[in-house]
Amino acid sequence: MDLNLCLLCGNSIDAEGLYCSNECRIQDKATTELFSDPLKSPSLNETIDYLALNYFDLFSRRSSMCSSSNSSIYSGIYYTELKNYSVEN
C-alpha cells in the first residue's frame, strides 16, 4: 500500500463526497467499521491490523488531509485507539 497517495486528496470527487486515494478509502472503510462497533478488537480486522503495524506514523501525519462527507473517523479518538493498539502489539 502506497500511502503517499493520500497526498492526492481532493483530486477525485464523486457523488458520495471527497475522497483520497484507494488506500485512504480502504482505511476509511476499516476504521468506519471499527467505530460502528467500538468494542470490536482491531486485531479482528485485517486491514486495521496491517495499518496499525505498518503505517500508524504515516497516517498520523497525513490522514487529516483525507476526508469524506459521510465520515468523521479522522479524530483524536481514532488516533488514540490506533496508537494504543500499535503500541500494545
Curated annotation (Swiss-Prot):
Pfam families from the UniProt entry: Ecl1 (PF12855)
Induction: Up-regulated transiently when the growth phase was changed from the log phase to the stationary phase.
Superkingdom: Eukaryota
InterPro entries: Ecl1/2/3
One Gene Ontology term from the biological process aspect of the record: phosphate ion homeostasis
UniProt keyword Acyltransferase present: no
Recorded GO CC terms: nucleus
Protein family per UniProt: Belongs to the ecl1 family.
UniProt keywords, alphabetically: Nucleus
Lineage summary: Eukaryota, Fungi, Dikarya, Ascomycota, Taphrinomycotina
Protein's name in the database: Extender of the chronological lifespan protein ecl3
Native source organism of the sequence: Schizosaccharomyces pombe (strain 972 / ATCC 24843) (Fission yeast)
Biological role stated in the UniProt entry: Involved in chronological cell aging.
Compartments reported by the entry: Nucleus
